[in-house]
Amino acid sequence: MPTDYYEILGVSRDAGKEDIKRAYRRLARKYHPDVNKEPGAEEHFKEINRAYEILSEPETRNRYDRFGEAGVSGGAAGFDPDNMGGFADIFETIFSGFGGMGGQATARRRTGPTRGEDLRLDFRLKFREAVFGGEKEIRIRHLETCQTCKGSGARPGTSSRTCTTCSGTGQVRRATRTPFGTFAQVSVCPTCDGAGEVIEEKCDVCGGSGRRQETKKLKITIPAGVDNGMKLRVAREGDAGLKGGPPGDLFVYLTVETDAEFQREGNDIKSDITISYIQAILGCTIKVNTVDGQEDLTIPAGTQPNTVLILENKGVPKLGNPVSRGDHRITVKISIPTRVTGEERELLEKLAKVRGETVGKGGIEGFLGNIFHK
């Protein structure tokens, strides 16, 4: 095995502690046997760990710099797993994603109060409900603190005791000696499952969990102007916490149904209306539907097909500022008849003569088409 530990980590001899730590993290991830299956990767991984063990501690690094491998060959003789310090911490950090040396995930102490889990609820709104908002009633199922044991998980009149296996830490640590150094494996305590406490007489109602699944009705406020895909946070309505920890939050994800008449574009509302060719030529005032009800819309004389007319401040309220609203944009469609009565034909032919136009091959219908494309 090469004994130039600086070369193994790819650092210079004057490298600082942080440089050595970064090099170790990078190489350990790359050559860990659970990740790298190439021949020789496991042996190189052992070399990397040995190099970091020597160079990360000032005392052993100094001996190595002065005497080489001979100065550190007995460095593991007085090893104490409880005094691993930074090496254990960095090792747990690096391999927390895919388990420790023994293949088990590293554990973090979780004996204190723990916040409850957040919950998600998908909720559908009609188009106008999203525009104007309002109060809605919902039903959720979440975990609430057991009222029989008050969240302790123990039968009333009894209490839990500190786990003797892990001394209340919720995790156990084991040191493994190898020819290449000594490593620590940290895992969840098998006796208390990481709780740090053992409940000998469990609550009959919640089975020792300290929480019960309950159905609850809530009234939530939908702000005016919400849109499809938005989420609302309802504080403290998620699952109850453990050991006095705060509850999680409820997140309501909104789906807005489409409307047969209106479309939304940002804070503007869009719709179409159809008028007759006479109304388009002469102009008029008509009633149109909006989300607020019917409104008067003035059609200017000579309005062309696909003209967009705007009703200001009749769109969607701006989220957080409902006094300010978008506009309602109305696209005008013009209906040109495919057939006309004899009286209508006579009048239209007179109009064509007044305009100095001849009725061509397209007939009166072609004449009307020409009017709206000039």
Swiss-Prot record:
Zn(2+) 1 binds at C146, C149, C203, C206. Binds 2 Zn(2+) ions per monomer. It is found in: Cytoplasm. GO terms for cellular component: cytoplasm. Pfam families: DnaJ, DnaJ_C, DnaJ_CXXCXGXG. Its cofactor is Zn(2+). It comes from the Bacteria. GO terms for molecular function: ATP binding; heat shock protein binding; unfolded protein binding; zinc ion binding. Residues 4-68 form the J domain. Zn(2+) 2 binds at C163, C166, C189, C192. GO terms for biological process: chaperone cofactor-dependent protein refolding; DNA replication; protein refolding; response to heat. A zinc finger (CR-type) spans 133-215. Keywords: Chaperone, Cytoplasm, DNA replication, Metal-binding, Repeat, Stress response, Zinc, Zinc-finger. The keyword Ion transport does not apply. CXXCXGXG motif repeats lie at residues 146-153, 163-170, 189-196, 203-210. PROSITE patterns: DNAJ_2, ZF_CR. The keyword Chaperone applies. SUPFAM superfamilies: Chaperone J-domain, DnaJ/Hsp40 cysteine-rich domain, HSP40/DnaJ peptide-binding domain. InterPro entries: DnaJ (IPR012724), DnaJ_C (IPR002939), DnaJ_domain (IPR001623), HSP40/DnaJ_pept-bd (IPR008971), HSP_DnaJ_Cys-rich_dom (IPR001305), HSP_DnaJ_Cys-rich_dom_sf (IPR036410), J_dom_sf (IPR036869). Participates actively in the response to hyperosmotic and heat shock by preventing the aggregation of stress-denatured proteins and by disaggregating proteins, also in an autonomous, DnaK-independent fashion. Unfolded proteins bind initially to DnaJ; upon interaction with the DnaJ-bound protein, DnaK hydrolyzes its bound ATP, resulting in the formation of a stable complex. GrpE releases ADP from DnaK; ATP binding to DnaK triggers the release of the substrate protein, thus completing the reaction cycle. The J domain is necessary and sufficient to stimulate DnaK ATPase activity. Zinc center 1 plays an important role in the autonomous, DnaK-independent chaperone activity of DnaJ. Zinc center 2 is essential for interaction with DnaK and for DnaJ activity. HAMAP family: DnaJ. Homodimer. Belongs to the DnaJ family. This is Chaperone protein DnaJ.
